[in-house]
């Protein structure tokens, strides 16, 4: 029987979207488990702040790369750094993504006003970039033992949104968000079957996470949950620890939904 190992000492992790609320929390979790880490995000200023905060709590190696992963040259840059410094990759967390509240013309708006440009951006960022990053990192992950890929999807990758939640708020649910997350969830299954047995691939699908939403939205959203609250970033940490370590050594191709019972109602 394999001994359960809650540590990532000696491991190397990569987190995309690392400057975001969830990405930074995931990064701190992996570092606290003892992993060296590479942080990737398009927002250099925020990424630097995340790195500074992580260095205050850990002596692990922390590398940052500010780039746009929709470009092949940026992906090559990430691969070269990991290859040169570490020679392997144990854990990849794809937390990159456009969310429903992102500020872009033709995005957080009604069905009739959603633009092709915002659609293309969402598919490229949330789905296409993830596939080609994994493809580029495959050899490095194969070199590591028990490597794990964790894709951050959404409950809207499996369930249609209840539009009543968005009534009388400044938040919409763009079609491309749900479509890209659905694609990510099912791409995870395809990758799990294609990369086995060397690499495990799983999805985490959070429900709505409490941030700066209006009281009206929060009340309407919470009414759909069983636990009478929205999620926090910390609610996702347990699943990250489970999937990143050998606690989940026999788990692949799965979608872990963390939504306070939202999708059961």
Place the predicted regions along the sequence by residue.
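Catalytic Tyr-X3-Lys loop
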Residues: 98, 112-131, 150, 177, ...
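Canonical Rossmann dinucleotide-binding motif of NAD(H)/NADP(H)-dependent dehydrogenases/reductases
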Residues: 6-38, 191
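Short C-terminal tail/terminal secondary-structure segment
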Residues: 2-5, 80, 161, 220, ...
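Conserved glycine-rich Rossmann-like NAD(P)H-binding loop of the short-chain dehydrogenase/reductase
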Residues: 33-50
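Short, small/polar-rich loop/turn modules that mediate ligand/substrate recognition or access, typified
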Residues: 146, 196-200, 251-253
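Substrate-binding pocket helix/loop in short-chain dehydrogenase/reductase
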Residues: 103-120, 163, 173, 221
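Residue(s) in the substrate-gating loop at a strand-loop-helix junction
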Residues: 154
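Conserved NAD(P)H cofactor-binding loop of Rossmann-fold oxidoreductase domains
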Residues: 95-107, 261
């Amino acid at each position: 029987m394999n001994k359960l190992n809650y540590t990532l000492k000696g491991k190397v992790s990569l987190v995309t979207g690392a400057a975001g609320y969830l990405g930074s929390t995931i990064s701190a979790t992996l570092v606290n488990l003892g992993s060296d880490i590479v942080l990737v995000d398009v927002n250099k200023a925020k990424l630097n702040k995340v790195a500074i905060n992580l260095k205050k709590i850990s002596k692990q190696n922390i590398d940052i790369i500010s780039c746009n992963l929709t470009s092949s040259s940026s992906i090559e840059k990430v691969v070269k750094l990991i290859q040169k410094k570490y020679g392997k990759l144990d854990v990849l967390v794809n937390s990159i993504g456009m969310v429903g509240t992102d500020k872009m013309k033709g995005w957080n708006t009604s069905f009739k006003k959603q633009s092709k440009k915002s659609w293309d951006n969402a598919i490229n960022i949330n789905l296409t970039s993830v596939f080609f990053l994994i493809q580029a990192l495959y050899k490095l992950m194969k070199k590591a033992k028990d490597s794990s890929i964790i894709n951050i999807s959404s409950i809207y990758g499996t369930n249609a949104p209840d539009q009543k939640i968005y009534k009388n708020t400044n938040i919409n649910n763009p079609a491309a968000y749900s479509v890209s997350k659905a694609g990510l969830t099912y791409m995870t299954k395809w990758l799990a079957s294609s990369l086995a047995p060397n690499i495990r691939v799983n999805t985490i699908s959070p429900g709505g996470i409490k941030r700066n939403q209006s009281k009206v939205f929060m009340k309407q959203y919470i009414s759909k949950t069983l636990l009478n609250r929205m999620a926090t970033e910390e609610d996702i940490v347990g699943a990250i620890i489970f999937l990143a370590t050998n606690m989940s050594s026999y788990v692949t191709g799965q979608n872990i939904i963390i939504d306070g019972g939202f999708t059961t109602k």
